[in-house]
A protein has these predicted regions:
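A short alpha-helical cap/connector motif
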Residues: 2-7, 11-145, 152-173, 177-221
Length: 221
């Protein structure tokens, strides 16, 4: 009798394990309402992003960096009308994080806020209308992901203000580090950003070879 009960119990546990595995698999593969809203917005506006927004391939790269490293505390310098912010916040909606994004132009800021609402991502974004030159040094942090896509002549200054607020393992990215010929921006065109971050021993920097190029720097210590 005991053997029969043991057999039934084992069968029950096996069935429970199989069912649980299927349920988890289905949950991971399920498309959320936010996923649907974001995909619809990105598709509907695919050829209408202007005002210095990132191309889709770069947005996807930002998304992947956050998901792969489970980043949660993000900062964006230069919102524009929200394309990159949507990709970043979409990833943060899955990791449980939040984005602070800063834009100085009122019209672009207001359009970005509307786009965030359409994408269903507003609760994951703290959008601020401000001068990043003044605001970034005042932010407390810490941050584990940063995306810089604003005035190129200030990139190094942004980096200097942000680096002390980066956690170990954090990722600092900067857009448009290539010139129109596909070469690294140097001298006046790049304002020394790449040279600066590559000179820091505690940063490991590579460049994602997209249209404009994204410098990706990981803080090792």
């Amino acid at each position: 009798m005991r053997t029969k009960r043991t057999g039934i119990l084992l069968l029950f546990l096996v069935c429970l394990f199989i069912f649980s595995g299927q349920a988890v698999s289905q949950e991971v593969g399920q498309e959320t309402e936010i996923d649907k809203k974001v995909k619809n917005l990105l598709q509907d506006t695919k050829y209408r992003w202007r005002d210095m927004n990132v191309p889709e391939v770069d947005g996807q790269k930002l998304y992947d960096l956050i998901i792969e490293n489970n980043y949660k505390k993000a900062l964006e310098v230069g919102t524009s009308t929200g394309h990159s912010g949507i990709w970043i916040a979409w990833a943060l909606s899955k990791t449980g994080g939040k984005l602070i994004t800063v834009e100085i132009d009122k019209d672009r800021y207001e359009e970005a806020v509307k786009n965030f609402e359409k994408a269903g991502l507003s609760k994951f974004i703290d959008a601020r209308l401000a001068d990043a030159h003044e605001l970034i040094p005042e932010l407390e942090g810490p941050f584990d992901f940063v995306f810089i896509d604003a005035d190129k002549n200030w990139y190094t200054n942004y980096a200097k203000a942000v680096i002390p607020k980066l956690e170990k393992g954090a990722c600092m990215t900067a857009h448009n580090v290539y010139d129109s010929s596909g070469r690294f921006r140097r001298g006046r065109s790049g304002h020394g950003y790449l040279e600066y971050v590559k000179s820091l021993s505690f940063l490991e920097t590579t460049v994602f070879s997209s249209g404009g190029g994204i410098a990706i720097s990981y803080k090792k210590e």
